[in-house]
Structure formats: C-alpha cells, structure tokens
Amino acid sequence: MALFVAEHRHTAEHCPAGNPQMAPFLLQILSPENAAKAGLTLHGDAVARGQHHLYVIVEGPNEAAVRQYLGAFAQTGTLDVIPASSCEEVVGRGAC
C-alpha cells in the first residue's frame, strides 16, 4: 500500500458542509469503515479553518484508487492526490 495526501479545495460559495444533501454523503466517504471496503486505509482528515481546504491522509494500492474513492469531492472544487511519505521514511532515506 502506498501513502497519499489528498487535498480538496472549494470556494465559500460551494462549501459542501453547508449543503444538507451533500454534507452527510461526504462524511460517509471519510468513514474509515467505508474506505476499508474500498481497499483504503484513512489515517486522518482535517479542514484548515476558514480556508475551505480539506486534507486527507490515506493509504491505497495506487493514486487512481484514492482519486476514484474521493472523487465526489471534485464535484464542488478541486481534488489533488499527492504521493507521500511518513516523516520516519523521509528521515530514514535522508531526503524528502
């Protein structure tokens, strides 16, 4: 499994948290149990307060699988899926 950081950005006008139909659906996507059914492991998520940026740390077989699973977030803005490493791995190899 590979590690990824997914970043979703949207405008205040398209904030899914304020959409009563979309918000519960997006929370289901961020459920560790639902991600596991898709073969992914969610390590955490955070929203930068007031910035309309969501960050998700996720392990998956490849970038395409992560992008497909989190694809609903792209409906309200952008979705970037970036290959990542843990700090321990970076220090172990001596470079980012």
Show the residue positions of the predicted features.
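Conserved RNP beta-strands of RNA recognition motif
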Residues: 56-57
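Short amphipathic alpha-helices in soluble, non-transmembrane regions
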Residues: 65-74
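Short S/T/G/P-rich N-terminal loop/turn motif that feeds into the first structured element of a domain
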Residues: 1-36, 41-52, 61-63, 87-96
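A common structural junction motif
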Residues: 73-81
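Short acidic-hydrophobic, aromatic-tinged amphipathic segments that line or gate anion-handling sites
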Residues: 82-86
